[in-house]
């Protein structure tokens, strides 16, 4: 993207990572602010964690005379400040600013929040939804919401000012056999989908695509990420977003103990 304004999308494995939208143990996301769960969730407390670009830490209130809505990260990192602001719909969201003046917005749009369906103010998670540098180059992130869970839907980048982004990464989902439920205070977050394929386009033309395949754990029945295969610009998707043809690279197989 322009001046490096492109999404940092990396697949990471954590043995304690749980059963996420890319199967057991694997993580794929752009970042989020979440409520601190270490001592149980209190929607009136200002206890938050921030994770983005491989950096993760707790948000601590900035020392006075900073306002009570300003935070710092409790670890050394690129962010000079994090602010809790009010979005257009009246709900809270966060903006982190790094040393170069680039801003990261979390949960500015309702679709990027994991929230109690009975109370829009009880937000559990704020997904990254916009990054913008000092020169006005930006990317936007949209989400698909299903059973209170949010999934990456589209990352659009290489936008500037009033120029809309030219590059779009689209994430296609499929139903999973091993639905996961997370109980947070007052509501339930159900992960009933998993990543199926990814479509990368520039100026409305396909650049490449990826197909994701899973196995089921013989012991637990959970989704195990088996392989990811890259296809060229000639990739063809069927109606359910499986790639049916195209120039394929050898699949990257991900064997691990399950």
Predicted regions and their residues:
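Conserved catalytic cores of ATP-dependent inositol ring kinases
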Residues: 1-258
């Amino acid at each position: 993207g322009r001046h490096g304004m492109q999404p940092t999308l990396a697949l990471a494995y954590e043995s304690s990572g749980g059963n996420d939208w890319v199967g057991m143990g694997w993580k794929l996301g752009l970042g989020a602010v979440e409520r601190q769960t270490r001592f149980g969730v209190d929607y009136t407390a200002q206890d938050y964690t921030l994770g983005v670009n491989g950096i993760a830490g707790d948000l601590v209130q900035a020392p006075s005379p900073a306002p009570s809505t300003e935070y710092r990260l409790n670890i050394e990192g690129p962010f000079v400040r994090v602010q809790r602001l009010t979005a257009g719909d009246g709900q809270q969201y966060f903006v982190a600013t790094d040393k170069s003046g680039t801003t990261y917005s979390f949960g500015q749009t309702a679709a990027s929040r994991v929230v109690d369906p009975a109370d829009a103010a009880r937000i559990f998670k704020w997904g990254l939804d916009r990054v913008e540098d000092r020169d006005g180059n930006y990317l936007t992130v949209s989400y698909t919401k299903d059973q209170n869970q949010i999934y990456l839907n589209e990352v659009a980048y290489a936008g500037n000012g009033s120029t809309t982004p030219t590059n779009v990464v689209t994430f296609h989902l499929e139903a999973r056999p091993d639905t996961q439920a997370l109980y947070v205070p007052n509501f339930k977050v159900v992960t009933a989908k998993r990543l199926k394929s990814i479509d990368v386009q520039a100026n409305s033309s396909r650049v490449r695509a990826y197909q994701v395949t899973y196995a089921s754990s013989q012991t637990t029945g959970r989704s195990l990420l088996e392989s990811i295969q890259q296809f060229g610009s000639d990739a063809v998707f069927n109606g359910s977003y499986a790639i049916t043809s195209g120039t394929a690279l050898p699949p990257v197989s991900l064997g691990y103990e399950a």
